Amino acid sequence: MLDYGEQLLLPLPHQGIPELRQAIADHLAAFRGMTVDPENILIGAGTDFLYNLLIQLLGRDKIYAVEEPGYGKIRRIYAAGGVTTVSAYMDSAGVLPGSLGQAQVLHISPSHHFPTGLVTPVSRRLELLRWAKEGENWIIEDDYDSEFRFDAHPMPAMQSLDAERVIYMNSFSKSLAPSIRISYMVLPGHLMELFRQKLGFYSCTVASFEQYTLARFLSRGYFEKHINRMRKFYKNRRNRVVSLLQSSPAAQRFTILEQDAGLHFLLRVETQLSDRELTGRLEEAGIRIQALSEYYHQGRAEDLHCLVVNYSGVKEERLEEMMGLLPEIL
């Protein structure tokens, strides 16, 4: 960092340093099919901070549709920000446009939905973009975890299909490390102008040292090499988990619902236990895992007998032990 000298001590541009914004724009062009003006990129310390900026920018009078099932924290962030949320119901192709009702903002993870792993096909994406354009609505594209597809190239981002109605969000916390609290969003040009007028007084929340380091990591190709290594590592980890399940004495009671996206998969289990009993017994055995039914907010789905298997944080030596306990628990 000696190369930057006194620059590290200067006040930060409110949107983040130009070097990092340019590096992110280049990365998005190469890997997500997006043509992005670095001036439309905003850097922040974590997506929670950026979501709160969006609430202020779009207005608290808006109704936000959130995927059902979905990541519960998103709904809590919006509620804490004072906005009304409704459920965006899904079928096998993703969010149903007809379920959006009076919503004016849709929060969606089309390239890797959590917890189902669903990848929204182009036809459904175009339907949702039509909903946004015709109603002058907004789509917040949460692209978290999209780097980790193992057997196919990632589908281009929705933002690449319509840069005027889509707000793109992503973070480096999963692809690098949770302690690296660097996230960013790409705003449509006219929305960025409004941001500068309305919220441009906010200071950038990421230290200059971290920004310059990440900018160099991206621009010199180290991030791409890192992602390729991690894809290989996690693919081997996934294959190990799948192999243990398939060789288990209870293998005939397991169905792996594979979507080739992200760092988890759904495991359907044949059992007489309720979801609550099943996850409770697993926790007693030292296996902390959630059922798919826990991710429903409205019209809660009971006893789907699907477990959300997140294998990214499990130590290799624990995998065989955990898989060996499953037949006894069931």
Predicted regions and their residues:
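Cytosolic nucleotide-binding catalytic cores of signal-transduction proteins
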Residues: Q246-L257, V269-T271, Y295-H297
